[in-house]
């Protein structure tokens, strides 16, 4: 496992090369093809996962089959940490958006790493705090922001993590369908498409298959506020 990717995870950002190499060698590796499910909401499990290649989506389903996307994650991001403290069922379904590879640590293996490594424990607390803050932001956005504002904010978040700056703007290969993007912002596909078309007509971005090119970050940022 690439040490640089491993250290992108807040939990392990403070590890030196020797410790990161030892940790990487103790992690099990899992590979999924696009569309494959790693685990379902309600499954039992006690592993923490770190994405090393590709992208995954974390989602929850309602009783009538509707899906809400909680997050899109890429290399260096981790999920499943709640199971280390609460052995209850998984709270979300994890599906590969692209071909993806993960490293995983079991509950017992991570506890051994936490023992005598206070910096790793602090990293875990930081990750949990960040996740809680993100949840609070999502709730606030659903209450106070309109759909175009939520779309703009989602695009900026994706650009921050997956964007590549070029002469014509920031290329964001998010690999999401229009329906998945709508699920991510908690709105209908039609409403999200209308917001995207409006942004494009204003010259803020250019739409491409499963990607966008953001040409005016400043105005898109203002719309996200």
Ranges and model annotations:
Residues 190:
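Key DNA-contact positions within bacterial/archaeal DNA-binding proteins
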Residues 198-199:
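Basic amphipathic alpha-helical segments that dock to polyanions
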